[in-house]
Amino acid sequence: MLKGIPSLLSPELLKVLMEMGHGDTLVIGDGNFPHASIAGDSPLIRLDGHGCAEVLDAILTLFPLDTYVDAPVSLMEVVPGDNVETPIWDEFAKIIEKHQPGTTIRHVERFSFYDEAKKCYAVISTGETALYANVILQKGVVK
């Protein structure tokens, strides 16, 4: 146990966050996300039983978002014609605003999101049941 580090962050995840450098990305995937096939040879960290919002909040206590890009946070946009509400996006926005005010969030078409996710340094698998709750974070620098 360590003080000041959310207990949700496993030693494996802390190691990955420390290994990542400026510009590296990671994806937090919901329960429907194809974690293993997207991860390929990248680290796949399982946080079953946890939701994407709580994982995002825990990670952002330690993880600086990139201020040198227009939008260091990417969400998978809803597929046209898919009549799905995305209230979790509001939760994400509040969490991001709490940790790094003024951060821009962009929405990425589904298959483009998958392509970007395949390039991520690591993939985090959650038990999130909300649809379209996938998020890519780009690491910044500690100032």
How would you name each of these model-derived features?
Residues 1-48:
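Long, hydrophobic N-terminal alpha-helical segment
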Residues 1-5, 18-23, 50-54, 97-101, ...:
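Short linear motifs at secondary-structure transitions and domain/linker junctions
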Residues 4, 8-12, 21, 50-54, ...:
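Conserved active-site and cofactor/substrate-binding residues in soluble primary-metabolism enzymes
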Residues 4-11, 36, 63-73, 102-117, ...:
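Hydrophobic transmembrane alpha-helix bundles
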Residues 80-143:
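Glycine-rich, aromatic-bearing surface loops/beta-hairpins
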